[in-house]
């Protein structure tokens, strides 16, 4: 009887030792596989071009992230505001500390010191070439000039809307505008644009494709020109390319972190006459002009009401960046 018990105990011991050996062997094999796999990953990773879908987002044509209109009472606590003004304002004020004064006045409206940036520009035409709107909210002051109404309205149309633009090779191709949202935008020191409409046989309608002097001139020596032609018709285009670039652009919608304040003038410029522009006069406003200090006082006093008509954006507009998007 004792022999049977000893034999049973011995069998259990042997099985236990065998099982322990098997488990240790499996553990060593798994460790070997795991370490070799990790080593393989470390070696191969530098040679693999993987995409981070959270960073490399596809281009949709909009430089900005859409947000709803601001509903909080103090969006400025975490936001920046850029105020663009003509240099003649500085000349008239003639005070080296005027910006510090304005900063203190903005502080009374809840805008912390350092959150408001004052940026000057020479004139509307020059500003049109390279508008750079870097802040969460951007307010552009444009002094009314009867001789520059076209420049003012085109600049407003440019910065109050988002555009998706492609380069145009006018030496090789004909171009047509597909719908009312499709425009040709030209920028440069001097832009003269001529067009020749073509029939179905690519022959000029009232012009010769080989003679640019017969083309129809739609813009002359402008710094910013937004050209609108008859949709669905091919055109041969001539542009002063040495001093101007032209892009085929599509209006995507309003750029709601920008407001234009017209300073002076009997009437406010109306860019909503364009059927592709949704009514947005709340971001195209007018203030009376007497002295520039009066203008800035008015802006400070009503800045928060102006902001309520806008939407904060997370990205900036640099015309060089937006203009070369494809």
From Swiss-Prot:
Query: Where does it reside?
Result: Virion; Host endoplasmic reticulum lumen
**Annotated Ca(2+) 1 binding sites:** 95, 206, 214, 216
For the region GPR motif, what residue ranges are annotated? 253-255
Q: What is its main location?
A: virion
Which organism is the protein's source?
Answer: Rotavirus A (isolate RVA/Cow/Thailand/A5/1988/G8P6[1]) (RV-A)
Region feature (CNP motif): 165-167
Protein task: Calcium-binding protein that interacts with rotavirus cell receptors once the initial attachment by VP4 has been achieved. Rotavirus attachment and entry into the host cell probably involves multiple sequential contacts between the outer capsid proteins VP4 and VP7, and the cell receptors. Following entry into the host cell, low intracellular or intravesicular Ca(2+) concentration probably causes the calcium-stabilized VP7 trimers to dissociate from the virion. This step is probably necessary for the membrane-disrupting entry step and the release of VP4, which is locked onto the virion by VP7.
Where, by residue number, does the polypeptide cross the bilayer?
Answer: none
Family from the record: Belongs to the rotavirus VP7 family.
- GO annotations of cellular component type: host cell endoplasmic reticulum lumen; T=13 icosahedral viral capsid; viral outer capsid
Residues the entry annotates as binding Ca(2+) 2:
177, 228-229, 231, 301
Q: Which InterPro entries match?
A: VP7, VP7_1, VP7_2
Q: What else is known?
A: Some rotavirus strains are neuraminidase-sensitive and require sialic acid to attach to the cell surface. Some rotavirus strains are integrin-dependent. Some rotavirus strains depend on ganglioside for their entry into the host cell. Hsp70 also seems to be involved in the entry of some strains.
Alphabetized Pfam families for the sequence? VP7 (PF00434)
Subunit organization: Homotrimer; disulfide-linked. 2 Ca(2+) ions bound at each subunit interface in the trimer hold the trimer together. Interacts with the intermediate capsid protein VP6. Interacts with the outer capsid protein VP5*.
**PTM note:** N-glycosylated. The N-terminus is blocked possibly by pyroglutamic acid.
Q: Which Gene3D superfamilies match?
A: Glycoprotein VP7, domain 1 (3.40.50.11130), Rotavirus outer-layer protein VP7, domain 2 (2.60.120.800)
Q: This chain belongs to which protein, by name?
A: Outer capsid glycoprotein VP7
